[in-house]
């Protein structure tokens, strides 16, 4: 789903969206936020524009919908909703979680609603993000216990993805992970978030191979 495209329009922390959250939860429908949706990412012009727009105006706004859901009480009210930020990398996630919690604690005088858990806990229980290549993020995944929240993708057919060299991309950044950690990041986490039936998928694969 799209984020708000400028400050004049209500974002997902507004209670007017509660009927939508109710339907999403009742349908057990996971939701995703893709980079470059919502605000126009083509904000910088001239020298360096391609890099500036990608880093500053495509990736960073992905924090906003996550903060909206985790800090506003949406996930507290709708605890079965699962959400994922897509194609935005993972290295920024530990910082964002710490930043949300720090703001909630230190701005407690005007932070509302008062939540029974810290904002980061709602991401850990209900959220995920995807990446193509992010070695820094993978190091932090282990250190900050976020292996269950990260999902690898090859972003086919886009040029910033890893296809057709996905195997090499996986090996050069996941060599320090255990087999269990790799399995989660390479598929099991996605199966959980998107309600895939692993056994059914494996059966279809085996049938196709045979």
Name each region found by the language model:
Residues 1-2, 31-33, 83-85, 127-131, ...:
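Hydrophobic faces of well-ordered beta-strands that scaffold small-molecule active sites
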Residues 1-65, 72:
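Active-site gating/metal-coordination segments in enzymes
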Residues 6, 37-39, 89-90, 133-135:
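Active-site-proximal loop/turn and secondary-structure-junction residues that shape catalytic pockets
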Residues 31, 35-37, 71-120, 124:
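Aromatic-lined glycan-binding groove of carbohydrate-active enzymes
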Residues 57-65, 108-139:
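Aromatic-anchored helix/helix-loop segment that forms the rim or "lid"
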Residues 72-73, 81, 91-92, 128, ...:
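Mid-to-C-terminal alpha-helical segments outside catalytic/metal-binding sites
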């Amino acid at each position: 789903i799209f984020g708000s495209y400028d400050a004049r329009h209500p974002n997902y922390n507004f209670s007017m969206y509660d009927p939508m959250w109710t339907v999403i939860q009742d349908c057990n429908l996971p939701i995703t936020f893709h980079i470059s949706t919502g605000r126009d990412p083509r904000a910088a012009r001239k020298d360096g524009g391609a890099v500036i727009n990608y880093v500053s105006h495509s990736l960073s706004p992905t924090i906003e919908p996550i903060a909206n859901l985790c800090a506003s009480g949406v996930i507290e009210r709708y605890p079965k909703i699962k959400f994922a930020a897509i194609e935005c990398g993972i290295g920024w996630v530990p910082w964002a979680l710490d930043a949300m919690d720090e703001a909630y604690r230190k701005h407690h005088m005007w932070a509302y609603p008062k939540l029974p858990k810290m904002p980061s806990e709602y991401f850990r229980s209900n959220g995920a993000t995807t990446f193509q290549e992010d070695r820094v993020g993978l190091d932090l995944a282990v250190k900050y216990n976020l292996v269950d929240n990260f999902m690898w993708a090859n972003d086919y057919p886009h040029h910033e993805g890893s296809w057709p060299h996905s195997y090499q991309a996986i090996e050069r950044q996941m060599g320090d992970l255990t087999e269990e950690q790799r399995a989660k990041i390479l598929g099991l986490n996605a199966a959980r978030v998107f309600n895939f039936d692993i056994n059914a998928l494996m059966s279809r694969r085996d049938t196709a191979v045979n």
